[in-house]
UniProtKB/Swiss-Prot annotation:
Primary localization class, coarse: secreted
Molecular function GO terms recorded: cellulase activity
Active-site residue numbers: E56, D117
Enzyme class per UniProt: hydrolase
Gene name, Swiss-Prot/TrEMBL: bcsZ
Enzyme Commission identifier(s): 3.2.1.4
Protein name as it appears in the record: Endoglucanase
Domain of life per record: Bacteria
Amino acid sequence: MMTMLRGWITMIVMLTAINAQAACSWPAWEQFKKDYISQQGRVIDPGDARKITTSEGQSYAMFFALAANDRPAFAQLFNWTQNNLAQGSLREHLPAWLWGQKDPDTWSVLDSNSASDGDIWMAWSLLEAGRLWKETRYTEVGTALLKRIAREEVVNVPGLGSMLLPGKIGFAEANSWRFNPSYLPPQLAQYFSRFGAPWSTLRETNLRLLLETSPKGFSPDWVRYESKQGWQLKAEKTLISSYDAIRVYLWTGMMHDGDPQKARLLARFKPMATLTMKNGVPPEKVDVVSGNAQGTGPVGFSAALLPFLQNRGAQAVQRQRVADHFPGSDAYYNYVLTLFGQGWDQHRFRFTVKGELLPDWGQECVSSR
């Protein structure tokens, strides 16, 4: 009788644990998988008629899978990326940035150039997956990928030093370089500094990029640097802070409070917080030189600013907007911004002062809506 009773108790405890794990999963991530990720591990952007997949999307999804302790999804994403974007090996090749429907009968790489924002997040996620899950294979591939990024996407710029190019082709001329300030999150730059040159100095040059290109407190989507003339802020085409730059504020907000760069960046970008508080919504576009804003940013912008805003009342306004207008199944970019911003806001993950992932795999249930 006692043996049978113990058996029932054990079964009840196990079922309770399983139900608790299911109930306390990350609902927004589970919905993202249903709406955007194929059974093979391909993140699909339905907003493009070619049903495209980008290295950025694959890398972000790998991060979310790691934060959610979703090892099967991570493995699927990794395998699909390696087999379809990296010619079978992320040790040997940077992933192509764009894949999709080439013609009615052909699905393949559409642009073989790389995109360093995806490469950076992918290398970091692999290294952290190796550490947290004790998976040597991920550590080895992440290390090899990071070395390849340093060889193929990092350049020495006179007057600046080591800088991360947006991709291996098309961003460097004889005396001119084009950069995207959102491509290297400061906490990831801090993490990579443990690997020595060029990462040990890239963190400081990346800070210069962020601070020196935001004269009015708004980071540009893209900016050019010339060897003898510096940053080209008054370019022939107006520099805009918009869909790329929103990630600069997101990364800044998610930095560890003990990181000395965070206070400097929050101070520099305070005008973005002030403008959002004044209008109740983030702007869609801001002229980097004049500070003039226009349009209303989509709901993903509100989610991205949840870690960045330091005023609790301002956070509450954007939090409510996200809850009221949660991205659907046809808004890839808004959804990934929401997974980052809202996920952080719900304490599903944090970054340590060294840039490592601090997941909350055992947290209480938190609603995503």
